[in-house]
Design a protein with these regions (language model features):
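A conserved acidic, glycine/proline-rich C-terminal tail/linker
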Residues: 275-290
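A structural motif detector for beta-strand N-caps
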Residues: 170, 176-178, 182-184, 188-190, ...
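Composition- and surface-driven signal marking solvent-exposed, interaction-prone regions
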Residues: 261-263, 278-279, 313-314
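Terminal amphipathic alpha-helical/low-complexity segments used for targeting or macromolecular assembly
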Residues: 1-167, 292-327
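A generic local structural motif
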Residues: 163-164, 176, 252, 284-286
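Glycine-rich, flexible loop segments associated with nucleotide phosphate handling
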Residues: 240-245, 289-293
């Protein structure tokens, strides 16, 4: 599978940003982001109440202003991106790029996300919205005094996707395992132990019961089995983008650090890294990275010798259960 090329077009969106008392941007929610051509300059600006009413609507204006309980202020913003091929300019810009991914307006790797970790604050994501960590204890006490539920769901730089975007045709059994910036194609089902990071996801109907790490692409009609792991690009200095082709099956508790072409199977419990020594049908032994991206192969471990073998495949492993993907 070819990694989607970075796109040159830009984007424009209006949204609501949550600011800490010191002005730190905790999040920005863009309900209707759009790709745009001819944007002259990248940047973000705070909107007046009148402009917010024009571009967002009265219901959004009513949410603006200070929230004393969390110690934050909610403002309306307009964010413009001249080209998604250039790095993000500010935190609003980062959130817009993550929204574009989860709205399926761009595919993973089509927007430049270099350096975004340094632009995102570590935030307490609560049932009442984002909260600065230095306000968390006071916010909890104020919530108790007001007799309202205040549940801390996560402490992280990335929020849950479904707090901002719920793509059509998708089922997610455990929403805290899908980060904003995940790209889930229509027909995707993410089961309870499935996980999808930002700038990663599915390009067609898929079953996700394992982990799709950052940067990973899974193509149509593929199944990431329970507990299966696909190595990403965030840790360990990895640069290679791992992809899974069409109609592939990763067995339960298997894993890959190489790309799979179409119609491939990795046996349950078998973990294939780039350096794994693999026995070929002719008896020769090669490193698995030499087979990266090949179509129609089965990786399995010999139950007697323990050696990893690769076998050509001419038959389908089956297919996804269509009833599980009518979302």
């Amino acid at each position: 599978m070819q990694t989607p090329p970075m796109i040159q077009s830009g984007a424009i969106a209006y949204g609501l940003a949550t600011l800490a008392k010191d002005g730190t941007v905790l999040d920005t929610w863009y309900p209707s982001p759009q790709l745009a051509e001819g944007v002259k300059e990248s940047g973000s600006q705070v909107l007046s109440e009148t402009d917010a009413r024009t571009h967002l609507g009265e219901a959004f204006v009513k949410t603006m202003g200070p929230c004393e309980l969390r110690g934050v202020n909610v403002v309306a913003v307009k964010t413009s991106i001249a080209t998604l091929a250039e790095p993000a300019k500010d935190t609003h810009d980062v959130f817009l790029r993550l929204h574009l991914l989860s709205h399926r307006l761009v595919k993973p790797h089509q927007a430049n996300l270099a350096g975004i970790f340094g632009m995102l604050a570590n935030v307490a994501w609560t049932s009442m919205g984002p909260c600065p960590l230095d306000q968390l204890q006071d916010a909890r006490l104020r919530a108790r005094a007001a007799r309202v539920v205040f549940d801390v769901k996560a402490v992280d730089k990335f929020p849950y996707m479904t707090d901002y975007v719920v793509p059509s045709g998708v089922r997610i059994a455990n929403v805290d395992r899908v980060r904003l910036g995940a790209h889930l194609a229509s027909g995707t089902t993410v089961m309870h132990e499935g996980f999808c990071n930002f700038n990663a996801g599915t390009l067609g109907a898929s079953m996700v019961e394992g982990r799709i790490s950052a940067g990973v692409l899974v193509d149509d009609q593929s199944d990431v089995g329970g507990g299966a792991s696909i190595m990403g690009t965030l840790s360990g200095g990895g640069k290679e983008v791992i992809s899974v082709g069409k109609r592939c099956l990763l067995g339960a508790n298997s894993g890959i650090g190489i790309s799979l072409g179409d119609d491939c199977v990795v046996e349950a419990g078998c973990y294939i890294t780039g350096g794994t020594r693999v026995k070929m049908p002719d008896g020769s032994v090669v490193k698995a990275r030499e087979l990266s991206g090949r179509n129609g192969i089965l990786f399995r471990r010999d139950s007697q010798s323990g050696a990893v073998q690769v076998i050509p495949r001419t038959e389908s492993w089956g297919s996804l259960n269509a009833d599980l993907h009518k979302n």
